[in-house]
Amino acid sequence: KIIRRLCLVLAGATAAGLLTSSLHAATPEEQAVLAPVKAMFDGMAKRDAAAIKEPLLPGGTMVLMRDGKPTQMTFDAFAERVGRPGTTHIEERIHDPLVRIDNDLAVVWAPFEFLVDGKVDHCGTDLFNLVRQDGKWLIASVADTGRKDCAAK
């Protein structure tokens, strides 16, 4: 029984990995949901507060989990903090996103790495809640975990 259960778990994990392993396999609707996430990351890399805010629902919030403690902030505060001009290059990368859509509501769950000057600074999991307003997907809230024990990528 134990071996059978293990085989079922491994088969399920393998199937889940195959389903979420490629961004190229995303449907057009999933790509539309991922577009505002990419736009926010592009704004972050440019250190452009206005570009960071563009794909965000006004009044939205973030919860950043660090060392088991939540830090909450508004999208405006996040954009002002990350959107300040600076000399360091920042980049956030997600991979293997899991996208779920129901009418005008979507969720994206994805592992991420945050790079500073090309080196992994921290990693974790991003969770984006999105809403479709007037035909356009907007990020309504973000939660993430962040830890330093990442393998260098």
Where are the language model's segments positioned?
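Short beta-strand edge/turn micro-motifs at domain boundaries
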Residues: 123-148
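Short, low-complexity N-terminal intrinsically disordered segments enriched in polar/charged residues
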Residues: 19-54, 58, 153
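Cleavable N-terminal signal peptides
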Residues: 12-13, 23
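N-terminal, post-signal-peptide region of Sec/Tat-exported proteins
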Residues: 45-84
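A mature extracytoplasmic/lumenal domain signature
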Residues: 56-58, 66, 110-114, 126, ...
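Surface-exposed, charged secondary-structure patches
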Residues: 61, 73-121
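Bacterial N-terminal signal peptides that target proteins for export
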Residues: 1-11
